[in-house]
């Protein structure tokens, strides 16, 4: 799914110059920052490694950035990989044996590790030991290799797909939440100074409130609005040029784009607001289920336009109002049912 509002990382995002290096520079996630500061200081005072840490939550909220900040704060090297990149146990063993004391190993999409790789990871996390099988058949033997004390940081957008044994081995699990408008304004104001952009308070406000609570999206929109300002000979980004650019990008006043409208209108027009199963929606929109669950649905749920129920997806009365579609006479969409993971 391609969209200016996708929270997934893009090769064109070029976030590196904008990434904060230390906790005091990081905007938002205040409780996480405060707790991490305590845990890091305590570990350093004891001369120990920081407990293994798991960041989970929607994409684009700063999981990778926080992992790099932890590495800087504890003074270790930062090694990065991802679950899909570690195909077999030998791949992980090669990474682990090259770690040094206090290094941070960051595994993105850690829920996508296969079982054989996880089994190698367990003793490495608990005892800093690596069990390697040498030889084959009856002559095979297990050799233990001691590893230096390191910190594993995992990141996932799908906590439910993480196996219980792996999840239980993280001493510091932390959920990252969507940002509010004021926090996103701080992110934008910091970035505008680094990018030498003249951003007014009203311009910052306009971009922030349409950024779906996600810093990655806010920074991407800032760069595109900068382009519109430059072509229109605007020396600063104010509310007017921000509104012009965002409308051209088809981002509406609450941060919805054409993909969101397709999703909501499909349920409204074909199922009177739902319930309808996620597989049906994915097939009708020619999208992958994972893309819908990770890119579109979290924000729609966050702002009260969508509910996940045991019977399927249901859009709310607020969604009908935003779509300017009359509310159906059936009260199905108004049921307030517990969320599920369908």
Curated annotation (Swiss-Prot):
InterPro entries: AAA+_ATPase, AAA_lid_4, DNA_helicase_Holl-junc_RuvB, P-loop_NTPase, RuvB-like_N, RuvB_C, WH-like_DNA-bd_sf, WH_DNA-bd_sf. Residues 180-250 are annotated as: Small ATPAse domain (RuvB-S). SUPFAM superfamilies: P-loop containing nucleoside triphosphate hydrolases, Winged helix' DNA-binding domain. Keywords: ATP-binding, Cytoplasm, DNA damage, DNA recombination, DNA repair, DNA-binding, Hydrolase, Nucleotide-binding. GO terms for biological process: DNA recombination; DNA repair. Pfam families: AAA_lid_4, RuvB_C, RuvB_N. Its EC number is 3.6.4.-. GO terms for molecular function: ATP binding; ATP hydrolysis activity; four-way junction DNA binding; four-way junction helicase activity. CDD domains: AAA. NCBIfam families: PRK00080.1, ruvB. Homohexamer. Forms an RuvA(8)-RuvB(12)-Holliday junction (HJ) complex. HJ DNA is sandwiched between 2 RuvA tetramers; dsDNA enters through RuvA and exits via RuvB. An RuvB hexamer assembles on each DNA strand where it exits the tetramer. Each RuvB hexamer is contacted by two RuvA subunits (via domain III) on 2 adjacent RuvB subunits; this complex drives branch migration. In the full resolvosome a probable DNA-RuvA(4)-RuvB(12)-RuvC(2) complex forms which resolves the HJ. The RuvA-RuvB-RuvC complex processes Holliday junction (HJ) DNA during genetic recombination and DNA repair, while the RuvA-RuvB complex plays an important role in the rescue of blocked DNA replication forks via replication fork reversal (RFR). RuvA specifically binds to HJ cruciform DNA, conferring on it an open structure. The RuvB hexamer acts as an ATP-dependent pump, pulling dsDNA into and through the RuvAB complex. RuvB forms 2 homohexamers on either side of HJ DNA bound by 1 or 2 RuvA tetramers; 4 subunits per hexamer contact DNA at a time. This is Holliday junction branch migration complex subunit RuvB. It comes from Rickettsia bellii (strain OSU 85-389). The gene is ruvB.
């Amino acid at each position: 799914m391609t969209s200016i509002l996708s929270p997934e990382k893009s090769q064109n995002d070029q976030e590196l110059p904008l990434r904060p290096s230390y906790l005091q520079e990081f905007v938002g996630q205040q409780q996480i920052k405060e707790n991490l500061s305590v845990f890091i200081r305590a570990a350093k005072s004891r001369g120990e490694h920081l407990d293994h840490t798991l960041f989970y939550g929607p994409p684009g909220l700063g999981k990778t950035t926080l992992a790099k900040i932890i590495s800087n704060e504890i003074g270790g090297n930062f090694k990065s990989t991802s679950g899909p990149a570690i195909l077999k146990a030998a791949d992980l063993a090669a990474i682990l044996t090259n770690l040094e004391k206090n290094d941070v190993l960051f595994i993105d999409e850690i829920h996508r590790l296969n079982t054989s790789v996880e089994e190698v990871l367990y003793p490495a996390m608990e005892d800093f030991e690596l069990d390697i099988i040498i030889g084959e058949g009856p002559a095979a033997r297990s050799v233990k290799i001691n590893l230096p004390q390191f910190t594993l940081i995992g990141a996932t957008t799908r906590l439910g797909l993480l196996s219980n044994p792996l999840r239980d081995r993280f001493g510091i699990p932390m959920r990252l939440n969507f940002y509010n408008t004021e926090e996103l304004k701080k992110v934008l104001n910091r970035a505008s100074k680094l990018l030498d952009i003249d951003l007014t308070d009203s311009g910052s406000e306009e971009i922030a409130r349409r950024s779906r609570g996600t810093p990655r999206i806010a920074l991407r929109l800032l760069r595109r609005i900068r382009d519109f300002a430059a072509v229109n000979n605007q020396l600063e980004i104010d509310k007017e040029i921000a509104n012009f650019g965002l409308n051209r990008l088809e981002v509406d006043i609450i941060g919805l784009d054409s993909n969101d409208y397709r999703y909501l209108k499909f349920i409204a027009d074909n199922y009177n607001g739902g319930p309808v199963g996620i597989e049906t929606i994915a097939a009708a929109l020619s999208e992958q289920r994972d893309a819908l669950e990770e890119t579109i649905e979290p924000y729609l749920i966050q702002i009260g336009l969508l509910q996940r129920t045991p019977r399927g997806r249901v859009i709310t009365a607020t969604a009908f109002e935003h779509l300017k579609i009359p509310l159906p006479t059936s009260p199905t969409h108004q049921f307030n049912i517990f969320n599920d993971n369908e």
